[in-house]
């Protein structure tokens, strides 16, 4: 019984540590503000994916959402952007879909599968946000060619959309790999005899 209690306590502490990690990184997600060419390079998608995959219950969705909303409340006014604007709402919807991808692979101990989920999440985010921009922006022709323009080169006078996809993809892969490895290490059971954790699978 004591061994079971020890494992339950260890799992609870691991979840609290991961929650703290998600909050800290979420609150620092706008690091490249002074470098427009690195727009969308952020840990946000990795946070939602891994929260869905590794957190349980109330914490699983409130942790990343709070981290995102707090930073948006602080930063968005400097851009003149409201949290209730349609594009912000579709962005939050995209985050929640990435969270559901994480839920779908919850329980996995494969780092490769987590990274694969991150790649899928980055593609979902790009297609949803750029597709929505195509729908509401009169600068895009409402045709197949206009949709392709929104997904690739974007609106003239602005950075190309493929640059956003590149940054989203690269940052999501990096943060998913690093944070996923940390999450797997935190969840490893500790042997009561050796005091050491077993090694997580990376395949």
Per-segment meaning from a language model:
Residues 2-62:
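Hydrophobic transmembrane alpha-helices
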Residues 81-126, 180:
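Short helix-perturbing small/polar motifs within transmembrane alpha-helices
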Residues 27-31, 50-58, 97-108, 182-190:
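Structural signal for the C-terminal ends of transmembrane alpha-helices
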Residues 30-36, 77-86, 104-108, 162:
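Membrane-interface helix caps and helix-loop-helix hairpins in membrane proteins
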Residues 21, 60-71, 114-122, 179, ...:
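Central hydrophobic cores of alpha-helical transmembrane segments
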Residues 23-31, 66-78, 122-131:
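Aromatic-anchored segments of alpha-helical transmembrane domains
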Residues 109-193:
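Membrane-embedded alpha-helical hairpins and interfacial helices in multi-pass inner-membrane proteins
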Residues 38-101:
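Alpha-helical membrane segments and adjacent membrane-interface helices in multi-pass membrane proteins
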